[in-house]
């Protein structure tokens, strides 16, 4: 399961830029990867983890702007098509031989 966060935050004033930076750092520290500008995604273990991370997002929302969340299954996420550009390093497929178990 994946949780995708889409946001559009104002960056007009110094306080706006600070709120943007604080929210973006929260996402990165909470395990989200940037998919593209203002779109971040995170792998989840199931609906319990989705609820937990939704609560964490709600607790760290900026006061202004627009923030949206979409939770999709791994199969739905894998069916996403990249139309222009190259896949990010995090998006490259890993086969069973490349996985190391400790």
UniProtKB/Swiss-Prot annotation:
GO biological process, alphabetically ordered: defense response to virus; maintenance of CRISPR repeat elements
Assembly mode: Homodimer, forms a heterotetramer with a Cas1 homodimer.
GO molecular function: metal ion binding; RNA endonuclease activity
Organism expressing this protein natively: Acidovorax ebreus (strain TPSY) (Diaphorobacter sp. (strain TPSY))
Identification of the protein by name: CRISPR-associated endoribonuclease Cas2
Pfam families the UniProt entry points to: CRISPR_Cas2
GN (gene name): cas2
EC number from the UniProt entry: 3.1.-.-
Required co-factors: Mg(2+)
